[in-house]
C-alpha cells in the first residue's frame, strides 16, 4: 500500500501553521475532527451534521487551499520518492482485473463533505492498485508521458488561474505567451521562418497530436475544395504509410474522406519502415489518372510502432510538385530535434505545410501539450472559425489579434503555454537537450545488451530512445518465434517489475523497449534486461519446445 509519509507528518503535526489534531485546522473557518460538519458549517469528528442548520462551504478559500495544497504536494512528492525507493509496492503494470473498482466505491456521491485524509486514504488503498505507473523508472512500454517539477508547477499555476483563453480578450496574456513560447520552440527546432508568428504562419498548442492531425486535415480539405468545388469531396485522396498513426485515419473519416480513399503505403525493412517516396509518387500518378484529387500527405518522424522516419526531402519535393498539403507528425521524435545531432531528421521541413510534436511526450511538459505550426494560418482559420454574437468584440476583429478558438476544434482552451514557458525557463534548452541525450544513451545501453546475447536480435535501426527487439527465430520458424515472444512479453509484464510493449513489423511479433520516464537510470535498464533474460532462458536457440 502507498504510504505517503511526509503528507501524514504534516497532517498530524501541530504548530506548523497547517494542521491541528488529525490534520485539519480549527479556529480558522475550516475543518476540525475528521472532516465532517458540525452545526456552524465546520467539522465535528463524528461524521454527522450537528445543529439545525448547515452553513455552506465556499468552493474556493485561500487558506484552505494553502493548507490542503501543502498536503497534496507532500502526497505527490512521496509518491515519486516511493516509486524510486520502494518499487516493490508499485507494480509498473497494474495487476487488477476489469471492474475491480466498482465494489470498492459507494453507489452514489456523498451528501456531506468528507475529509481530505479520507479521500487520500482511498487514493492509496483503492486507486493506486489500478494505476499503471507511467512515471515509474521501470516503465518502458510506450513513449513517455514525461513529467517534471517545472511542468507540474506550470499545471498548478494553470489550475490556479483557471482562465479560458479562447480569444485574445478573454486573457491577453494566455494568447500572447503562447505565440511567444511557440516562436521560441520553433527557433530551437530551427523551423523555417514561415512557421513563425511574424509571417503568415504561426503556432498553436493543441491538446494532443491527434487533434493536431485532425485540424490540418480539415484545413487542407477546405483549401482544395475552394479550388475544385465542394461536390468533389468524394474524389479527395490522402496518403500515409502503414506505419502512420491511427489518428490519421480517424481524422480523415471525421473530415468526410471516404475510407477507400485513404492510401496507406506499404513499408518494409529495406527503408527501416519509412515511407518509400517512389511508392508515393506512383500512387499519386495512378490516382490522378483515375480522376481522383490528391490533397494531403501525412509524413511521420518517429512512428509509434518503431520510431521509423519518413524521408522528408523527397516527400516534400513530391508534395511541392503536385501542390499537395504535406503534414509532418513528429509527436515523439520532434522533441529530440532540439538537439543539433538529431535535427537532420526533419531536414526538408521547409516544404511542409504543417508540423506537430508532443511536448508532453519528451519535453517534460506534462499532459497535455501538443504544439502545432502551420505555414498559412488563414487556411486553418478559414476551416475552423466561428463568430457567434456573444464572442464579437471590436478588438477581436483586428488582424493583429490572434483568437485561438479559430485554430482548434473546441472553444474552451487551457493556458497550456504557462507550463511550456516554465519548462523552457526553469531548465533552459541545454538541460532539456541533455535530458533527451540521457534517454537515448540509456536506450543504446539496452540495445548493446540485446546485441551481445545471441538468443536475441535487434529488429530495426535505432534512431532515438526506442529499441525494437525480439527473441531470434530457431531454424527460421517465424510462427514459433512469434509465439515465443508473445509468451515472453506476458511473463515479463506479469512480474509487475517492468512494463514493455510490442508491435508487429512485416508479420513479426516485436518487443518494444522505450526509454523516457524522468526517473529512469542505468540501473533500471540493467535490471530490466536481467528480468527479460531470466524469463527468456527457457527459449534458448537450442530449445525447440
Swiss-Prot record:
Upper lineage: Eukaryota, Viridiplantae, Streptophyta, Embryophyta, Tracheophyta
Residue numbers carrying N6-(pyridoxal phosphate)lysine: 361
Main localization category: cytoplasm
Annotated localization: Cytoplasm
Protein name: Tyrosine decarboxylase 2
Annotated knockout phenotype: Slight reduction of pollen grain size.
Annotated catalysed reactions: L-tyrosine + H(+) = tyramine + CO2
Signal peptide: none
Similarity remark: Belongs to the group II decarboxylase family.
Keyword vocabulary terms for this entry: Cytoplasm, Decarboxylase, Lyase, Pyridoxal phosphate
Function text: Converts tyrosine into tyramine, a precursor of isoquinoline alkaloids and various amides.
Alphabetical list of InterPro entries matching this protein: Aromatic_deC, PyrdxlP-dep_de-COase, PyrdxlP-dep_Trfase, PyrdxlP-dep_Trfase_major, PyrdxlP-dep_Trfase_small
Species, as recorded: Arabidopsis thaliana (Mouse-ear cress)
Span list, region Disordered: 23-45
GO cellular component terms, A-Z: cytoplasm
Amino acid at each position: 500500500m502507498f504510504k505517503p509519509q511526509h503528507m501524514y507528518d504534516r497532517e498530524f503535526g501541530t504548530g506548523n501553521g497547517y494542521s491541528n489534531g488529525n490534520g485539519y485546522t480549527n479556529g480558522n473557518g475550516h475543518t476540525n475532527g475528521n472532516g465532517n460538519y458540525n452545526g456552524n458549517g465546520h467539522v465535528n469528528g463524528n461524521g454527522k451534521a450537528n445543529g439545525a442548520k448547515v452553513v455552506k462551504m465556499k468552493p474556493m478559500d485561500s487558506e484552505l487551499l494553502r493548507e490542503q495544497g501543502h498536503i497534496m504536494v507532500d502526497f505527490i512528492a512521496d509518491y515519486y520518492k516511493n516509486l524510486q525507493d520502494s518499487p516493490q509496492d508499485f507494480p509498473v503494470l497494474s495487476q487488477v482485473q476489469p471492474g475491480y473498482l466498482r465494489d470498492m466505491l459507494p453507489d452514489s456521491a456523498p451528501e456531506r463533505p468528507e475529509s481530505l485524509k479520507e479521500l487520500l486514504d482511498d487514493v492509496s488503498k483503492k486507486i493506486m492498485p489500478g494505476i499503471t505507473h507511467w512515471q515509474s523508472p521501470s516503465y518502458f512500454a510506450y513513449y513517455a508521458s514525461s513529467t517534471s517539477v517545472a511542468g507540474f508547477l506550470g499545471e498548478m499555476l494553470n489550475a490556479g488561474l483557471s482562465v479560458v483563453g479562447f480569444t485574445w480578450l478573454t486573457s491577453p496574456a494566455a494568447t500572447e505567451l503562447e505565440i511567444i513560447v511557440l516562436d521560441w520552440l520553433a527557433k530551437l527546432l530551427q523551423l523555417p521562418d514561415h512557421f513563425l508568428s511574424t509571417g503568415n504562419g504561426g503556432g498553436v498548442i493543441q491538446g494532443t497530436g491527434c487533434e493536431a492531425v485532425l485540424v490540418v486535415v480539415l484545413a487542407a480539405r477546405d483549401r482544395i475544395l475552394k479550388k475544385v468545388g465542394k461536390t468533389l469531396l468524394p474524389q479527395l485522396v490522402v496518403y500515409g504509410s502503414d506505419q502512420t498513426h491511427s489518428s490519421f485515419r480517424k481524422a480523415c473519416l471525421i473530415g468526410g474522406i471516404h475510407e477507400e480513399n485513404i492510401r496507406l503505403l506499404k513499408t518494409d525493412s529495406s527503408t527501416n519502415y519509412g515511407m518509400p517516396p517512389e511508392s508515393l509518387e506512383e500512387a499519386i500518378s495512378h490516382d490522378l489518372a483515375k480522376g481522383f484529387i490528391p490533397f494531403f500527405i501525412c509524413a511521420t518522424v518517429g512512428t509509434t510502432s518503431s520510431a521509423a522516419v519518413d524521408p522528408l526531402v523527397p516527400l516534400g519535393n513530391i508534395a511541392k510538385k503536385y501542390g499537395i498539403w504535406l503534414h509532418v507528425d513528429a509527436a515523439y521524435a520532434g522533441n529530440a530535434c532540439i538537439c543539433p545531432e538529431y535535427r537532420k531528421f526533419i531536414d526538408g521541413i521547409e516544404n511542409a505545410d504543417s508540423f506537430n510534436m508532443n511536448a508532453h511526450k519528451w519535453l517534460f511538459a506534462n499532459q497535455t501539450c501538443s504544439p502545432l505550426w502551420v505555414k498559412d494560418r488563414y487556411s486553418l482559420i478559414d476551416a475552423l472559425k466561428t463568430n457567434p454574437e456573444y464572442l464579437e468584440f471590436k478588438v477581436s476583429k483586428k488582424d493583429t489579434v490572434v483568437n485561438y478558438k479559430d485554430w482548434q476544434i473546441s472553444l474552451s482552451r487551457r493556458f497550456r503555454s504557462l507550463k511550456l514557458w516554465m519548462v523552457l525557463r526553469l531548465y533552459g534548452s541545454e538541460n532539456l537537450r541533455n535530458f533527451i541525450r540521457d534517454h537515448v544513451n540509456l536506450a543504446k545501453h539496452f540495445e548493446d545488451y540485446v546485441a551481445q546475447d545471441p538468443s536475441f536480435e535487434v529488429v530495426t535501426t535505432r534512431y532515438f530512445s526506442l529499441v525494437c527487439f525480439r527473441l531470434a527465430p530457431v531454424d527460421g520458424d517465424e510462427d514459433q518465434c512469434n509465439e515465443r515472444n508473445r509468451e515472453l512479453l506476458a511473463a515479463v509484464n506479469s512480474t509487475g517489475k517492468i512494463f514493455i510493449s510490442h508491435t508487429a513489423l512485416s508479420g513479426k511479433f516485436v518487443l518494444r523497449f522505450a526509454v523516457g520516464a524522468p526517473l529512469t537510470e542505468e540501473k533500471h535498464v540493467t535490471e530490466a534486461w536481467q528480468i527479460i533474460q531470466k524469463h527468456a532462458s527457457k527459449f534458448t536457440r537450442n530449445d525447440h519446445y
